[in-house]
Amino acid sequence: MTKNLPIRLAAGSGPTFGVDDLACAAATHLGCWEEEGLDVTWTPVHGGVAAMRAVLDDVVDVSYGGLGPVLRLASEGEPVRIIVSMARALAQNLVTREGITSLDQLRGVSWALDGFGALSHHMARLVVRALEIGEDEIDWQAVGPPPERIERLLAGSIDVSLIRVEEAAALNSDAGNGLHTLLGFAELKDLVPVQPHGVLATTEAYERAHQDELHRLTRGMIRASRALNDD
């Protein structure tokens, strides 16, 4: 029996997968990567910037996170490479405190992010730009992954955040928590048609030395996407 090749991945999505991360979740839990002969281990981190930093520090081999951090590192001269893309849109809602009922009221709000430069930051900046609100009119706060952002929203110590659709639905089902969805998935897609999205990325050195592993990783993602489409 051939031994599976090991590969270490950092999950910028944190310890859990959301709707945005369905392809990665499917590849992991449906055994798509295992079928390609890979032994994948995940390390959860807070955001795409941390995921790429883990790659550059040789803590992991491949990052899963937003496109933005990879492009930024590449523009700064870091030897990074994108392997495969996940999707072309984010399954998120803009959740706000109950008192914020119009888009004009977003000026001056505190807005929770995974971290500065993370996918949630990139998408939030695009939303603000589309609404013709200056970035300096927002109190940006790096809070952490969705559970931490939701906790801050519920505590009333933050005004606004982009939250996964399934988590937003759970919040909306509780009429007494003081929160509501200001912009849903379809409205955000109309507002920002071209959205940042998740990618798998690595270093140029790893790409040169481990092409077989990366080919298998990509084929596993294709398997997962087809399985989701067929379901």
Q: Language-model segments: which ranges?
A:
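Rossmann-fold dinucleotide-binding core
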Residues: I150-L153
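Short, glycine-/small- and polar/acidic-enriched structural segments
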Residues: T2-D136, W140-V143, A155, D159-V165, ...
